[in-house]
Amino acid sequence: KDVWVVVFLALVSWVLLKLPAIWGQINEELFYQRGLAIIVFNGIILFTMWQNRDFNKKNILTYGLPLAFVALFISLLPKSGGDSIVLALIHTPLFLWCLFGLAYMGFDYKNMHKRMAFIRFNGELLIMTGLILIAGAMLTGITIGLFSAISMDIEHFYVEYIATLIGMAAPLVSLYLIGLNPTLTRKIAPVIARTF
């Protein structure tokens, strides 16, 4: 069941990411500057809540209201401005990361053990997501190379659609794999540490 939730959230995130291409009136640069973090973290937070089965009214409001406020605030910022807009854009993913932490802890922010577990989990998530993205980049290179060998140029299509879908799915797949096998990244991390 979790696999289908991952697929659904990845597809929804990907469709939201492609909104400027679907609806030509959206300024692509502004959209990605202001909306990318919201799209990515929204999928991650929703899947975390799904894993924890935390969809009660209080938790939905605790997650939904701040997210809606941030999305509205960011969208209403002037198109061009000074350092205050840059700072707002920098702090948006940090704020969303805090919301992700709340969701991971089951909204029990007073529990110190859960706080420490979340800090540790971030490292595991980064490692797993990084490995998936590296594998995706290798797959992209191999696929484009194979099609080039038969004189078919699919680079634009692949990067525009498939690669972006892989990018949206990577953190969600990482969450799923870590939930499925929590010791997986703990075995990988020492190998990476010894390698570098």
Predicted segments with their positions:
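Extracytosolic (periplasmic/ER-lumenal) interhelical loops and adjacent juxtamembrane/interface segments
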Residues: 140-141, 172-176
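Hydrophobic core of alpha-helical transmembrane segments in multi-pass integral membrane proteins
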Residues: 7-20, 61-76, 169-174
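Membrane-interface helix-loop-helix junctions at boundaries between adjacent transmembrane segments
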Residues: 25-34, 44-166, 180-194
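N-terminal signal-anchor module of multipass membrane proteins
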Residues: 1-46
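Extended aliphatic helical segments
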Residues: 3-7, 12-15, 40, 70, ...
